[in-house]
Amino acid sequence: MRMDEYLRTVTEQVRCSRMHDSIAEELKDHILDQAEAFEEEGTDHEQALELAVREMGDPVETGVALDRIHRPHMSVEMLVLVSLISVLSLVFYGSMLVFAEDASINGMEYWFQQQVKYTMTGFLLMLLVCRIDYSVLGKWSRQIAGGILLFILLSLVTGVQVYGRIYGLRVGPVMIPTFGMIWLYVPAYAAVLYTYRGRSYKGLTGLLIWTLLPVFLVLRLPGLNQAVMLLFICLLLFSIAVGKGWYQVSPRKMLAAVWGMMILAPAMMLGTGMLAEYQVKRLQAWLGYGEPSYAAQTAYECLRTSRLLGASGNHVWQKLPGWNSEYILVSLTSAYGLLAAVTAVTLLLLLWVKMFHISSHQKNQLGMMVGYGCSMVLLAQSGLVLVMNLGLLPSAAITIPFFSAGGSNMVSSYILTGLVLSIYRYKDILPGNPVKRMHPASAE
């Protein structure tokens, strides 16, 4: 069999057409190397090629074996975890209808219906995003990130306000929540970092805009907690990129400057008058000043009287502000017992570990960084809500993925999860792109 016939037969067995060229090229190189070895033993060129092809084995069997490798995959473990978390969330809100006795209390029936609607919508979006090739983020990273920043800016100018805070931007009959879009900026930012590979100090100045502009815009919404979290995640992603040798800079000097800026950021915000008076007080509370709020004291009292298993009798939906958002874990504990909250946190932790494992084992550098970004968002939200529910941080408007009420929180969490599923799905299809470690340079 001729080499071109062999390669054609092999690639015909592989259903993923985008892999045909790379598979054919790899097999061709192997055949030519083997043929060269036969020629060194005295065999003429044509016969050497024929022998090399014959040693490759049956082309159909080879193609079928390669098809099993180079095809989209689904992370069943991750899908099961998300499904369990979604079901647990719906069970919790459904049970509140029973515990509340009167479904009209605090709009209990409304919250249950909203949770069902957004859980189903988010789950379907997750499956849709999973099927989309995540590499489009690398190709259109700046356009996507710029579009999200433009959306936030338009929200500031023409957005709908609720209690003095920008809620969302109305596009025709549809209201698009602004705060959900903030977290979708993170994977786009990770892709922007990828496009700056090989740059030196001068070439990286543009990254300052991509890093600080969204933080400034979020502060104006206003969203102090979200701005601090966003800045921390972006700097952490940038630090990973520096540590991986993506840029022609001194890692020590660059990381010292980056984290020095992070440490000085609160002082700069306080000193420049960027923050409103209530934001200053909130930042001071986070730094350890001030008395615990009513919500924090109520949450502590609910936890103190909770049981290991079973309802405590505390009607948290009546007396705890944020019972279905930032204090959702306290509500779970009051309704079902401490084990229920531990189960929820454990499932979220397992999901994050799985997401981080998928990201860290990517040969494709873009997939690795985007996966890290998605994982960090879910970890930061879950971790802050956990420590806040334990009384270790003051009360703040932070939501926990999949559980806290609100369509923007639900949908953004599912989309970020879908991106990680997409990274896993295409792990054996998109080529790896190892980055050579850069050395510091004075100019680009």
Predicted regions located by residue number:
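Soluble N-terminal domains of membrane-associated systems
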Residues: M1-L79, S83
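A structural signal for hydrophobic alpha-helical transmembrane segments in multi-pass membrane proteins
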Residues: E50-Y163, T343, S375, M410-H439, ...
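Transmembrane alpha-helical segments and their membrane-water interfaces
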Residues: Y110-L137, L184-G198, L236-W246, V353-K354
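Hydrophobic alpha-helical transmembrane segments
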Residues: K117-L125, S334-M355
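Membrane-interfacial helix-loop-helix modules of multi-pass inner-membrane proteins that assemble, modify
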Residues: L154-I176, E277-A285
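Hydrophobic alpha-helical segments of polytopic membrane proteins
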Residues: T205-P214, N225-G271
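Hydrophobic, glycine- and aromatic-enriched re-entrant/interface helices and adjoining loop segments
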Residues: S250-T343
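Loop-to-helix entry and N-terminal half of a specific, functionally important transmembrane alpha helix
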Residues: I358-A397, F403
